[in-house]
């Protein structure tokens, strides 16, 4: 009769009876009276909040069905990863596998104990701690001993790669605690009419959770074998749901459906920048990002004093001082300080030019080359000389121009010691000593030291006169000839004599004028 009565009850009532009054589950009349009272709306708890607290404590002391005890914890964690060997199998293991087995088993057991699992010490752990051989007695049964041993060795190796972490075990304990509190709270909700008691219980549960997390963080703070300080941070976030019921009485439930959906309330914690709202998965990445906003540069080069916001940037910079070039081209052996420079260099071998100008379809191997090229279409010259106001498309052209004002000539010829303000000028000059003429005309075979000279020469074969005067229509093959012609119209005389101050339109005219002064000086001496 009692069992049949339990079957006819609603699921919630049947579960509550088995949990709350196991003795009454076998009694007919008392059971039916209690259940009838509960569903007619009478309060099963006529005591005050202290009675409810006492009942909660008694429920916590009971072994709730479906929740792991110390024994089940051992079965679900340690015994699942434990591997048993017979005496024969243990003897066949290589010393390296025996040592690996000892390390894995002892580490997993230590992690279980450190996060608070209450379990008796397995015999295999005692044997390993004493230095004894941890083999078990022979087990009768079918199977190939050699294949069984092979699978055990593979299990040891895979387990060594993924030993049970303290944080993972702690999350399991927290889930069990949440499920237990969930059942306790659900029971109180069903049998109590005191809403304020329920709310206080909910606050107590959340306070217990917060305290458990703080305790866990303190527990796992330790010093590893390398002397580094390790703090394991829990990434489990507990969500609190508020369900509204149709009844006039307000009911707030602290519900975690971890039994049916164990991962639905677990999400990875993220870190958001409160300035630009960018999100990061690791706190160290957020810290590095914040230096963009603060301008902080804590990493300083000891050689030159230059500061950087990231340690990686400092390491890359230091290669300038050490001369280290770790990235080497497999094609030609050329080495680079940066991987990006090597990637750009590879395009010289592959011929790849992924950056294309939208206006003229000219392609470039580097993005910076495309940016500089686009300024020829837009006319932009963003780099201005502070001395004379002249503007340039590229910063290197401005740097070279500034040397005109400073008189700096940092490039010296090793053959004749002549100095130059531009590296290109030195390169061109050195061809005088070497006799190199790398630019050859395909039409007549004539060779030139500079590319501009070859370009000017080609107009002899093509007959093209690309430079035409807007005032008189006269055309010229060379840009230099065109500029000289324009001085006829403008009256410009940039070449001035240092002795008499007379100015000339052409440099050749100034040279002829200097001859007059030299002849006059010679006559005066005679």
From Swiss-Prot:
Q: Start and end of every SCAN box domain?
A: 1-39
Gene induction: Up-regulated in both visceral and subcutaneous adipose tissue of diabetic individuals.
Please provide the Gene Ontology terms (biological process) for this protein.
lipid metabolic process; regulation of lipid metabolic process; regulation of transcription by RNA polymerase II
Q: In which tissues is it expressed?
A: Expressed in visceral and subcutaneous adipose tissue.
Under the heading Gene3D superfamilies, the entry gives: 6.10.140.140, Classic Zinc Finger
Record's Pfam families? KRAB, zf-C2H2
| GO terms, molecular function | DNA-binding transcription factor activity, RNA polymerase II-specific; RNA polymerase II transcription regulatory region sequence-specific DNA binding; zinc ion binding
Q: Can you give the residue ranges of the KRAB domain?
A: 76-147
The record's subcellular locations are: Nucleus
> What are the entry keywords?
DNA-binding, Lipid metabolism, Metal-binding, Nucleus, Repeat, Transcription, Transcription regulation, Zinc, Zinc-finger
InterPro entries listed in its UniProt record: KRAB, KRAB_dom_sf, Znf_C2H2_sf, Znf_C2H2_type
Query: Which intervals hold the zinc fingers (C2H2-type)?
Result: 271-293, 299-321, 327-349, 355-377, 383-405, 411-433, 439-461, 467-489, 495-517
The entry assigns this protein to a family as follows: Belongs to the krueppel C2H2-type zinc-finger protein family.
Free-text function comment from the UniProt entry: Putative transcription factor that appears to regulate lipid metabolism.
The name under which this protein is listed is Zinc finger protein 69 homolog
Q: Which organism encodes this protein?
A: Homo sapiens (Human)
Q: What is the lineage of its organism?
A: Eukaryota, Metazoa, Chordata, Craniata, Vertebrata
């Amino acid at each position: 009769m009692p069992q049949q009565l339990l079957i006819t009850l609603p699921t919630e009532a049947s579960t509550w009876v088995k949990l709350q009054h196991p003795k009454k589950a076998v009694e007919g009349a008392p059971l039916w009276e209690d259940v009838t009272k509960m569903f007619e709306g009478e309060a099963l708890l006529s005591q005050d909040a202290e009675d409810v607290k006492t009942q909660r404590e008694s429920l916590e002391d009971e072994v709730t069905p479906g929740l792991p005890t110390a024994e089940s914890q051992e079965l679900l964690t340690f015994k699942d990863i434990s591997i048993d060997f017979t005496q024969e199998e243990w003897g066949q293991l290589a010393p390296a596998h025996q040592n690996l087995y000892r390390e894995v088993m002892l580490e997993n057991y230590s992690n279980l104990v450190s996060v608070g699992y209450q379990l008796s010490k397995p015999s295999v752990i005692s044997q390993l701690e004493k230095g004894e051989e941890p083999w078990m007695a022979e087990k009768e049964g079918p199977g190939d001993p050699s294949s069984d041993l092979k699978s055990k060795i593979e299990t040891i190796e895979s387990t060594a790669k993924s030993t049970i972490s303290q944080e993972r075990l702690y999350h399991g304990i927290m889930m069990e605690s949440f499920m237990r509190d969930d059942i306790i709270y659900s029971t109180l909700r069903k049998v109590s009419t005191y809403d304020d008691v329920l709310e206080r219980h909910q606050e107590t549960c959340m306070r217990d959770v917060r305290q458990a997390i703080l305790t866990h963080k303190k527990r796992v703070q330790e010093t590893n074998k390398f002397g580094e300080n390790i703090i394991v941070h829990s990434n489990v976030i507990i969500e609190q749901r508020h369900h509204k019921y149709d009844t006039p009485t307000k009911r707030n439930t602290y519900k975690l459906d971890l039994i049916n959906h164990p991962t639905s309330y677990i999400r990875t914690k993220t870190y958001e920048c409160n300035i630009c709202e960018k999100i990061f998965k690791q706190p160290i990445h957020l810290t590095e990002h914040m230096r963009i906003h603060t301008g902080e540069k804590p990493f300083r080069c000891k050689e030159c004093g230059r500061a950087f916001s990231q340690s990686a940037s400092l390491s890359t910079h230091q290669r300038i001082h050490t001369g280290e070039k770790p990235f080497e081209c497999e094609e030609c052996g050329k080495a680079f300080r940066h991987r990006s420079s090597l990637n750009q260099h590879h395009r010289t071998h592959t011929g790849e030019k992924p950056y294309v100008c939208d206006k003229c379809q000219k392609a470039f191997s580097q993005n910076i080359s495309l940016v500089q090229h686009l300024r020829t279409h837009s006319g932009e010259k963003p780099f201005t000389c502070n001395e004379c106001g002249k503007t340039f498309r590229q910063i290197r052209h401005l740097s070279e121009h500034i040397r005109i004002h400073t008189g700096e000539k940092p490039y010296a010829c090793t053959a004749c010691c002549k100095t130059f303000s531009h590296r290109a000028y030195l390169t061109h000059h050195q061809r005088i000593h070497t006799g190199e003429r790398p630019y050859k005309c395909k039409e007549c075979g004539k060779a030139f030291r500079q590319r501009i000279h070859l370009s000017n020469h080609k107009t002899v074969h093509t007959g093209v006169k690309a430079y035409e005067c807007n005032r008189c229509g006269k055309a010229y093959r060379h840009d230099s000839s065109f500029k000289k012609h324009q001085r006829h119209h403008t009256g410009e005389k940039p070449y001035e004599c240092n002795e008499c101050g007379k100015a000339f339109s052409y440099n050749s005219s100034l040279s002829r004028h200097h001859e007059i002064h030299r002849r006059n000086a010679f006559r005066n001496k005679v």
